[in-house]
Structure formats: structure tokens, C-alpha cells
Amino acid sequence: AVNDLEKTESYFLDKLGFSVRFRVDGWSFLSLGSFHVMLGYCPDELPARDTHEHSYFAYVNCEGIDEIYRDYQQSGAEIFQTIADKPWGLREFGVATPEGHRIMFGQDRPLGG
């Protein structure tokens, strides 16, 4: 649910590299490779940023995470968690949308020890 469909869609397209699959009244269907997102216009819903820890929207498993991270830095995407190797076997970072939805991107890496 997003309060401003046009602004949110533009962010996904311009900052995160998604493309439009199709649009229907109040909905925008976007893709990034094989990852798909449906944005629904809900003007009266509480913005994601106001839900605090419940604002996580998606986790994207991907390849080439360092390149994706650099691309997002260069595009001006809002990065709320910098890229890092995590003890649970992933290299990951997080971005936030203008309304505060948080999306994590992660790539598998070998576990040490």
C-alpha cells in the first residue's frame, strides 16, 4: 500500500532500476529481473515509515550484490543499511522507499568456520 503511487513508482524505476510490467487503475506492476512488485494506491493507509519495524517490504536474493549496491549509491537510492557480510551467510544491504518501505538485498556467501 502506497499513498503516492506516481512518486513511489518513479522511485522504483529511476533509483532502483525496475521496469513497468503493466498498470491498471490504482496499481502498478513492476519487475527487476525475476523479482516482481505490485504497488497499490491506498491514500488513507498509514505510511510505512510510521509502522517502524513493521515497514520491511521484501527481501531480494540476488547475484552481483556489490555492483547493485554501487548502482544504487550512484542513482541516489536511500540506503538505510550499508552493505556488509552477515554471520548468517549473506552479504546484504537495505534501501528505503520515499514512504518508508524497507527492502533488503542479499547474496549468499560461504559461511566461515
Segments predicted by a language model, with ranges:
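Conserved beta-strand-loop-alpha-helix junction that forms the acyl-donor binding cleft
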Residues: 2-5
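Vicinal oxygen chelate
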Residues: 10, 19-63, 67-96, 107-113
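Conserved ATPase active-site switch/coordination loops adjacent to the nucleotide-binding site
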Residues: 99
